[in-house]
């Protein structure tokens, strides 16, 4: 049975924006990638955004799973209730697919909807097997201490852009292709530097008091 990673996207298209390089890297090495879509936007958008997410999953080779009903995570919604739903429903999905890794936005990703999903996954970890790993990504806010870096090339980026382009309705609103390519360019320089800095041990205490 193939090992499984569950990615929890706060909105459709973030499976193609958050950390698509790492997900595709696992997919290419035999992992099953379960793409959980937590919300579908405003009611009048839901049919379109679900269809776009299904097409993106087809392009990526991911298994799409939609929370039902979709989360309401706009400003003014009951974000505490949405957090509880994530904390309850993610373990059920992890158990169904026997996942080894859960991936989500950081609980500190600045965007309120991203943080709802991140906090919900964080709470769910208390009920999940101790051997399961939780990976976080940051888009709206940088991770404070990143410890995983996956380098990829232009062909990989073109593949990610092809997946993202399934979201034509969202790209008309805001061209996230520029964000995906720009983050890749920036992290080609900063990524390994930030991971190596985070991995350094703290300085040893001074053997003698210093004032």
Describe the predicted segments one by one.
Residues 1-3, 52, 56-64, 77-81, ...:
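The feature marks non-catalytic terminal segments
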Residues 1-132, 165, 182-186:
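Active-site beta-strand->loop->alpha-helix modules in alpha/beta enzyme cores, enriched
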């Amino acid at each position: 049975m193939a090992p499984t990673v569950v990615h929890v996207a706060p909105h459709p298209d973030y499976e193609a924006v958050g950390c698509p390089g790492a997900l595709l890297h696992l997919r290419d090495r035999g992992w099953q990638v379960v793409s959980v879509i937590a919300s579908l936007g405003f009611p009048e958008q839901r049919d379109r955004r679900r269809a776009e997410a299904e097409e993106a999953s087809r392009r990526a080779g991911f298994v799409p799973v939609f929370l039902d009903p979709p989360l309401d995570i706009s400003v003014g919604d009951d974000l505490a209730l949405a957090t509880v739903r994530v904390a309850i429903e993610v373990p059920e999905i992890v158990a169904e697919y026997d996942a080894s890794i859960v991936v989500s936005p950081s609980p500190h990703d600045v965007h309120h909807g991203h943080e709802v999903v991140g906090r919900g996954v964080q709470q769910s970890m208390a009920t999940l097997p101790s051997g399961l790993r939780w990976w976080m990504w940051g888009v709206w806010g940088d991770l404070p201490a990143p410890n995983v870096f996956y380098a990829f090339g232009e062909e990989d980026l073109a593949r990610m852009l092809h997946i993202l382009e399934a979201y034509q309705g969202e790209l008309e609103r805001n061209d996230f292709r520029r964000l995906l390519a720009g983050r890749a360019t920036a992290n080609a320089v900063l990524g390994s530097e930030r991971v190596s800095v985070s991995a350094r041990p703290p300085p040893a205490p001074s053997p003698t008091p210093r004032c």
